[in-house]
Structure formats: C-alpha cells, structure tokens
C-alpha cells in the first residue's frame, strides 16, 4: 500500500473531468492537481513551450511526493508525455492512447475526434488510432473555442450550444458512430454535444480508460492506497477563484483546499 498522492495536471479546468472519474474509481487515492491557468490556453502554444510548462509542473508535483503523474490534458500529452516519462522518476501516463484504445474496443467503422488546435494539428489521435485499427475511418476537427466556453463557466448556456453547433458542423451528414472528446474540457459539454449530434453518436471520454490503466499500474506495483481520509488539493497558476468555481461545480464530493502557486523557471 502507498498513501502518497497521485499528481494530475492540465492547462486549466479540464483536468477536473479526469479527477471526477478518478474519485469515482479510486476513492481512497489522494490527489494533487495543478491547473496551469496562468498559461492558458495550451492549444495555441508551440510544442517547446508546452514541454517547458509541463516539466515545471512535473517537478512541482515531484516535490509534493506524488507516486504517479497523470497528464490530464491531450495537448500536453501529445507534446510532453515522452519527455516527462524520461525526466521524472515516477510513472507518467497521458490521455491520448487510453482514449484511442477506448474507441477501438468497439467495432466502429467511422468516428470523429475533436480537440485543441495543437492536438488536431499534430495528428496525435489519428496516428494512434491508425496503429490500433488501420481500417477505422477518422474525421478530426479542432474545436478550440469550446475550451474557453468551459474555462469561463459558460456550460449549460445558449452561448455554449451555439459554439458547439458551429464547431461540430464539420460532422453534419458524416454518419460518425462515435466522437472522441479529445480535450479534457469537453466532457463538461456532453449535453450540448449530444444536442448537436444526436444521442445515437457515442461520446468517448478518455478519462475512464486512463484511470483504469492508472489503477492497473498501481495495482501491479502494490501502490494502491487504503486511505479512508483521502484528500484533493488544488493549485492554480492563475486566479484560484476560477479553479474554486469549477471545483464547486464539477467535483460533487468537494475538495480539501485550493491555492495559487507560482512556478519558476526551475520548477
């Protein structure tokens, strides 16, 4: 058994969708989350910029004595997963391969992928899906504006529905069977996405397969926690009030504390 916390990072509030699943599946695990809202958004940054930011956060989490790091951000997974796996002395997992694996476990013939500009531009999902199932037809489309809708607390509004309708127009008449939510902000827009695409299109949230793999890894290393008083500590590099608002809305069982942090160049 290992009561050390699991470290989780994202560019903003999206990582809360992964923490929500983590708490459902592994309620006895403590969590330390860093939302890098001071550098939001990641989706329009260069690979090198994202790597630098992710490495700083990884070093901070290491200082908090985490036993594992989850990159709860598709953009950062695509840009920095391999780097962090090489640089940090703990297991580091991302969300892209689990998301692709979740999609290919079903016998879909045609699916869609939405993500940030960066995630879609570098073809992270398309490449991974092609390796897992070369016969799968994949339509990828950036939906960068939807990230800000979530970050600004506008889910459930007419503005959110209009933005979703516009960004997902590319899938009109395409007969996709499923859609990978290739940004951790997007699960908070599932209602609006279903309204646009119809309930027959399956929405794939990579968080579920990601946490399943995390549990499998920790089980194999005998590092699962038996802590009955587990905690969720949240940190923001931006305005902690925004993270508090998101946590109050999307973490049904609450959190332990939320604070602002500054991450210097050395991490």
Curated annotation (Swiss-Prot):
Top-rank taxon: Bacteria
Molecular function GO labels: glutamate racemase activity
PROSITE patterns: ASP_GLU_RACEMASE_1 (PS00923), ASP_GLU_RACEMASE_2 (PS00924)
Pathway annotation: Cell wall biogenesis; peptidoglycan biosynthesis
Chain segments annotated as transmembrane: none
UniProt entry keywords in alphabetical sequence: Cell shape, Cell wall biogenesis/degradation, Isomerase, Peptidoglycan synthesis
This enzyme's EC code(s): 5.1.1.3
Keyword Isomerase: yes
SUPFAM superfamilies registered for this protein in UniProt: Aspartate/glutamate racemase (SSF53681)
Residues that hold substrate according to the record: 10-11, 42-43, 74-75, 184-185
GO biological process: cell wall organization; peptidoglycan biosynthetic process; regulation of cell shape
Catalytic activity: L-glutamate = D-glutamate
UniProt-annotated catalytic positions: 73, 183
InterPro entries, A to Z: Asp/Glu/hydantoin_racemase (IPR015942), Asp/Glu_race (IPR001920), Asp/Glu_racemase_AS_1 (IPR018187), Asp/Glu_racemase_AS_2 (IPR033134), Glu_race (IPR004391)
Entry function: Provides the (R)-glutamate required for cell wall biosynthesis.
Record-stated family: Belongs to the aspartate/glutamate racemases family.
Protein name as annotated: Glutamate racemase
Species this chain originates from: Limosilactobacillus reuteri (strain DSM 20016)
Gene: murI
């Amino acid at each position: 058994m290992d009561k050390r916390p699991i470290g989780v990072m994202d560019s903003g509030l999206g990582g809360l969708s992964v923490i929500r699943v983590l708490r459902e599946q592994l309620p006895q695990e403590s969590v330390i989350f860093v939302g890098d809202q001071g550098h939001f958004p990641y989706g329009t940054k260069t690979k090198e910029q994202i790597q630098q930011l992710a490495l700083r956060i990884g070093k901070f989490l290491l200082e908090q004595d985490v036993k594992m790091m989850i990159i709860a951000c598709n953009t950062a997974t695509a840009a920095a997963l391999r780097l962090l796996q090489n640089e940090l002395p703990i297991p580091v997992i991302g969300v892209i391969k689990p998301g692709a694996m979740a999609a290919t476990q079903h016998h879909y013939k045609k699916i869609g992928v939405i993500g940030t500009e960066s995630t879609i531009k570098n073809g992270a999902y398309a490449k991974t899906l092609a390796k897992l199932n070369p016969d799968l037809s994949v339509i990828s489309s950036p939906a960068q504006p939807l990230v800000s809708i979530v970050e600004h607390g506008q889910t459930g509004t007419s503005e959110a529905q209009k933005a979703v309708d516009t960004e997902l127009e590319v899938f009109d008449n395409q007969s996709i069977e499923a859609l990978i939510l290739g940004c951790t902000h997007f699960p908070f827009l599932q209602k609006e996405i279903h309204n646009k695409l119809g309930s027959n299109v399956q929405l794939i949230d990579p968080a579920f397969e990601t946490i399943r793999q995390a549990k499998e890894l920790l089980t194999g290393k005998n590092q699962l926690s038996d802590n009955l008083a587990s905690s969720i500590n949240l940190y923001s590099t931006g305005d902690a009030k925004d993270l508090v608002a998101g946590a109050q809305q999307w973490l049904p069982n609450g959190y332990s504390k939320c604070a602002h942090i500054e991450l210097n160049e050395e991490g």
